[in-house]
Amino acid sequence: MRALGTIGGSLANNDPAACYPAAALALGATIVTDRRRIAADDFFVGMYETALAPDELITAVEFPVAERSAYEKFRNPASHFALVGVFVAKRTDGVRVAVTGAGASVFRATDLESALTADFTPAAARAVTVSADELNTDMHASAEYRAHLIPVLAARAVTTANG
């Protein structure tokens, strides 16, 4: 069992470079525990930190189906974790964009969401400038490079989602 990973385990761990948190956040998932239901928007609270109580267990994750969605990531070559990953989900109520690998925790890119809700095209994603102010700088990439990658990967995700 120790060699197996689960979606619930990945969400509970909330590694800042993990892929599943981006899917949960962009799709607007609901994390179901042994005692409550938590919207993804309220679940991820910081680096390796979630809204789970110490003795709370994830029992299910409910993912709404988007009209279109796609995930693109720029991988760290050694770990294959996301240096930056962007999940784009076009839903009936608008577009949600979640970014992983760039900050202390997965987050929504609201400027990209607004641009893509108005025009779901790669050009609209590329036209957005992302601030590096809240992004990570480490031995793998600067905050500025991560800020550059976010709209590039969002544009690729839109291309994939549009088929």
Question: What are these model-derived regions, one by one?
Answer:
Residues 1-163:
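C-terminal structural segment of proteins
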